Structure formats: structure tokens, C-alpha cells
């Protein structure tokens, strides 16, 4: 598949969402709401569910599947209260010894005036800091777009995976082209240079696994992700805490 098709597929409105994966993979998934400071951000969803006999905290960025839903979800662009909600749930997971699984699909954090006034940069930075030392296993999965710091704020993890037709980048191809050439129409040319596809990033050791989507129905893809999670969480849970944290630290220091 060429780069233009991959970018279109990553942004496709019909792609599986965080809630599709959360309810399809985890039994008895219960959503939790709010950051306990300002409000509940519809762009970030999270809660607790069971993976076999293991309780897991699930957090992710939610895009809508219709215009009405996208307005509710702010088109998957979190406000600072969304990142603070995510951090609240991750710290709760740490307190009770639950592993964390994050699902990421965002063009980036919301850049509006209100978001900046409420500390968007601080909220993202704090998530990076806290996740780097969170004392439970973390797996992050990019399921569509992984855009800039808005995606990275949920991706400081022991394992970072990508669905095959997802992308992960410092900014959008359109933004890159506008900055580099002052011409947003050269976005796909920029995408080729940026190396944003799953297989390119796996080759560069930015991500640890690419989960195939080819020929799989939605149910089959969810089942595949569930199987991978069960295997990897069991493996990570066996690691001594000091080793887990040191490997996570070294994973990101090497960049």
C-alpha cells in the first residue's frame, strides 16, 4: 500500500476506536470520567476492565464515527483536562497494581486558546514525566493517527505497537509540507520523507510490533490484539519492577 493510501486509511472515520477495542477486548469494561479539576473531556476515554483474571486500566483517545460524535469528541483532539484524566487513571492503576493499556488515535492535542490557558503543554509534559516512572507495565497501541506530543503523552510505555495501517509522526504531513516548502499540497511527498508508517518505524526501532490488519474483519482484528496483549502483559508482569523501569528509561533515552 502506498503512503497516500496508508494516511487515508489511518484517518478513515470508520476505523475501530478506543471504545471498540476496550469493549471488545476487556470483560466488564467500566468507564471512569473527569480529571477532578475542570471537566470531563470526551476526546479521552478510560476505565477498568478484565483481561482474563487480570484487572487492567484502559485509557485512549476517542474519535467520533459521525459529525455529531466528532463534535462531542473534539475530533479526537484532547484538551489538557483529557490528559489529566488519563494521568489520574494511570496513577490509580499504579496504586492498585493494575497494568495500563493505552490506545492512541489523534492528529494532535487541541491547540485552542482555552486549552493553552489551562496548561496544555504542562499537562502533556507531566504525562511524559509520570509515565516514564509509572510502577506498573504499560503497553501503548497506535490504532490510527499518532500525531505529535498529543500522541506521545499516552505512549511512554514498555511496549509501543502500531496497527499496520496507522501512522506516527511529530506532526501531520500537511504541516510538515507547509513548514518545509510553504506548500501544504505536497503533503504526501512530505510523508515519504518523514517515515511515518508502521513498518518504517518498526525498522527504525521506534515501535516494537506491527499488528497486521490485512484481510481481517473488525472482530478478527480485536481478537488478534487481545491475544497479543494477553501474551505480552503476562511477560511484562514477570519482570522485577526495577528492571521494568530501567528498560523503559533506556528505551526512550536511546532516541
From Swiss-Prot:
The keyword Cell inner membrane does not apply. Residues 1-235 form the CoA carboxyltransferase C-terminal domain. GO terms for molecular function: acetyl-CoA carboxylase activity; ATP binding; carboxyl- or carbamoyltransferase activity. One of its GO terms (biological process) is malonyl-CoA biosynthetic process. Gene3D superfamilies: 2-enoyl-CoA Hydratase, Chain A, domain 1. Its EC number is 2.1.3.15. InterPro entries: Acetyl_CoA_COase_a_su (IPR001095), ClpP/crotonase-like_dom_sf (IPR029045), COA_CT_C (IPR011763). Inhibited by pyrrolidine dione antibiotic moiramide B (CPD1). The keyword ATP-binding applies. Keywords: ATP-binding, Cytoplasm, Fatty acid biosynthesis, Fatty acid metabolism, Lipid biosynthesis, Lipid metabolism, Nucleotide-binding, Transferase. It is found in: Cytoplasm. Pfam families: ACCA. Pathway: Lipid metabolism; malonyl-CoA biosynthesis; malonyl-CoA from acetyl-CoA: step 1/1. Its main location: cytoplasm. Component of the acetyl coenzyme A carboxylase (ACC) complex. First, biotin carboxylase catalyzes the carboxylation of biotin on its carrier protein (BCCP) and then the CO(2) group is transferred by the carboxyltransferase to acetyl-CoA to form malonyl-CoA. Belongs to the AccA family. This is Acetyl-coenzyme A carboxylase carboxyl transferase subunit alpha. It comes from Streptococcus pneumoniae serotype 4 (strain ATCC BAA-334 / TIGR4). The lineage of its organism: Bacteria, Bacillati, Bacillota, Bacilli, Lactobacillales.
Amino acid at each position: 500500500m502506498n503512503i497516500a493510501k496508508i494516511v487515508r486509511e489511518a484517518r478513515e472515520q470508520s476505523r475501530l476506536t478506543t471504545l471498540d477495542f476496550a469493549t471488545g477486548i476487556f470483560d466488564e469494561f467500566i468507564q471512569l470520567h473527569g480529571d477532578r479539576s475542570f471537566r470531563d473531556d470526551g476526546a479521552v476515554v478510560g476505565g477498568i476492565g478484565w483481561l482474563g483474571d487480570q484487572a487492567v486500566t484502559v485509557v485512549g483517545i476517542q474519535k467520533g464515527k459521525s459529525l455529531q460524535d466528532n463534535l462531542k469528541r473534539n475530533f479526537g483532539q484532547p484538551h489538557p483536562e483529557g490528559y489529566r484524566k488519563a494521568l489520574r487513571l494511570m496513577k490509580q492503576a499504579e496504586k492498585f497494581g493494575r497494568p495500563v493499556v493505552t490506545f492512541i488515535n489523534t492528529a494532535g492535542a487541541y491547540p485552542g486558546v482555552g486549552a493553552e490557558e489551562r496548561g496544555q503543554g504542562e499537562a502533556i509534559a507531566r504525562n511524559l514525566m509520570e509515565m516514564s516512572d509509572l510502577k506498573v507495565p504499560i503497553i501503548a497501541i497506535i490504532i490510527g493517527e499518532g500525531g505529535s506530543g498529543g500522541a506521545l503523552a499516552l505512549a511512554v510505555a514498555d511496549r509501543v505497537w502500531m496497527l499496520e495501517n496507522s501512522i506516527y509522526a511529530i506532526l501531520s504531513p500537511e504541516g510538515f509540507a507547509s513548514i518545509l516548502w510553504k506548500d501544504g499540497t505536497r503533503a504526501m511527498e512530505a510523508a515519504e520523507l518523514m517515515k511515518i508508517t508502521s513498518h518504517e518505524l518498526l525498522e527504525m526501532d521506534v515501535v516494537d510490533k506491527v499488528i497486521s490488519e490485512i484481510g481481517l474483519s473488525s472482530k478478527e482484528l480485536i481478537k488478534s490484539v487481545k491475544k497479543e496483549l494477553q501474551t505480552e502483559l503476562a511477560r511484562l508482569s514477570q519482570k522485577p519492577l526495577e528492571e521494568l523501569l530501567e528498560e523503559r528509561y533506556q528505551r526512550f533515552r536511546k532516541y
